[in-house]
């Protein structure tokens, strides 16, 4: 019995003391690991991408997740008219992108006499642009959902949203503006980033079209996950998980061959 009590006492000390669990066995090596990581961090390739047009998001039971997009208007119709009259407009970049959004704000007819507030919703699929994010009942952090509220106090101005986003469609809503003055937005672009330097070699000409499409989607996905590390996803979690690192590294060896 004494041995049992002694064992229980020792276990209690370990559990409630916490000293053993607080030790960092790799403390001396961590600084060196960070230096190596910084020295081998790849340079990101930046490409400016523009929107291809305004689209309508329409309910369609046969479409993926019940929503489909149709071309609506060219971008000039947004850039030359009042943004207040176009709140809720949805833009299509024509492809999935990962990067940083920049836009210009300008006065229309008279100088702004109040701050402007805009909401940007970044959607990977049409349903995200059509359906509201709130109320949110998911278990993951609400902050992972890609919507940003931007307040502009000075007009004219060029604004870059600091959050990196991954999306294809962009919805812009006007949350607040002066009743006396008007404004317009223009020159919306994305600075897309990736560490991929060269495109992958094309498949053989005899490859079936379906396989070519699957391969292209896979390459686009891999390219956007290849940032300063192999990310598990450019939207979420944006982390270097060991399983994703292994799979993405294998795919890179046989596609982009980006070994820097």
Predicted regions and their residues:
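Hydrophobic, small-residue-rich membrane helices and short re-entrant helix-turn-helix hairpins
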Residues: 234-236, 248
